[in-house]
């Protein structure tokens, strides 16, 4: 069960970081 908890926390952290960067700095792949 601990492995599942670790994966869940890591996934939540990665998603939070991704959204924070995406909302703070708009994606640049749209306009090359």
Swiss-Prot record:
* Principal subcellular localisation of the protein: membrane
Membrane topology per record = Single-pass membrane protein
Q: Which GO terms describe its biological process?
A: photosynthesis
Kindly state which keywords UniProt assigns to this record, in alphabetical order: Membrane, Photosynthesis, Photosystem II, Thylakoid, Transmembrane, Transmembrane helix
**InterPro entries according to UniProt:** PSII_PsbT (IPR001743), PSII_PsbT_sf (IPR037268)
Give its localization. Answer: Cellular thylakoid membrane
Give the transmembrane ranges.
Answer: 3-23
Q: Would you indicate the residue range of the signal peptide?
A: none
Report the superkingdom from the record. Answer: Bacteria
What is the annotated quaternary arrangement, including any partners? PSII is composed of 1 copy each of membrane proteins PsbA, PsbB, PsbC, PsbD, PsbE, PsbF, PsbH, PsbI, PsbJ, PsbK, PsbL, PsbM, PsbT, PsbX, PsbY, Psb30/Ycf12, peripheral proteins PsbO, CyanoQ (PsbQ), PsbU, PsbV and a large number of cofactors. It forms dimeric complexes.
Name listed for the protein in its UniProt record: Photosystem II reaction center protein T
| Biological source species | Prochlorococcus marinus (strain MIT 9301)
Q: What is the lineage of its organism?
A: Bacteria, Bacillati, Cyanobacteriota, Cyanophyceae, Synechococcales
Gene this chain is encoded by = psbT
């Amino acid at each position: 069960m601990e492995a599942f908890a670790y994966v869940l926390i890591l996934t939540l952290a990665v998603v939070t970081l991704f959204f924070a960067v995406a909302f703070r700095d708009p994606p640049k792949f749209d306009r090359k």
